[in-house]
């Protein structure tokens, strides 16, 4: 029941944000350059107030903390293969190798 109330409250908040957004159109119309500039400046301030109000009305939940699986995947993604040195071309001969070859 509590989840349903939260969902309805969220929908109401989103409806309010949408209504506020629709009632704040971008300014159009004739006028001098300073009049158009002032209209744009006032509209920008209204937009910033709308965004601030929307942030107060609807705050996003904190992202989930990384699970052990996510951390393991990130560790695997950070692995790199380092270049190995070339193997030696001439091997030293030892007595144990010669004995095996003769028998």
Swiss-Prot record:
Pfam families reported for this sequence: REV
Cellular component, GO, one term: host cell nucleolus
GO biological process, one term: mRNA transport
Gene source species: Human immunodeficiency virus type 2 subtype A (isolate Ghana-1)
The protein's assembly and partners: Homomultimer; when bound to the RRE. Multimeric assembly is essential for activity.
Family matches, as InterPro entries: REV_protein
Region of interest called Disordered, as start-end residue ranges on this chain: 21-43, 78-103
Biased composition (Polar residues): 92-103
UniProt-annotated location(s): Host nucleus, Host nucleolus; Host cytoplasm
Motif annotated as Nuclear localization signal and RNA-binding (RRE), chain positions: 35-49
GO molecular function, one term: DNA-binding transcription factor activity
Keywords, sorted A to Z: AIDS, Host cytoplasm, Host nucleus, mRNA transport, RNA-binding, Transport
Protein name: Protein Rev
Secretion signal span: none
General function of this protein: Escorts unspliced or incompletely spliced viral pre-mRNAs (late transcripts) out of the nucleus of infected cells. These pre-mRNAs carry a recognition sequence called Rev responsive element (RRE) located in the env gene, that is not present in fully spliced viral mRNAs (early transcripts). This function is essential since most viral proteins are translated from unspliced or partially spliced pre-mRNAs which cannot exit the nucleus by the pathway used by fully processed cellular mRNAs.
Motif (Nuclear export signal and binding to XPO1): 71-82
Region (Homomultimerization): 16-24
Domain of life: Viruses
Record text about domains: The RNA-binding motif binds to the RRE, a stem-and-loop structure present in incompletely spliced viral pre-mRNAs. This region also contains the NLS which mediates nuclear localization. These overlapping functions prevent Rev bound to RRE from undesirable return to the nucleus. When Rev binds the RRE, the NLS becomes masked while the NES remains accessible.
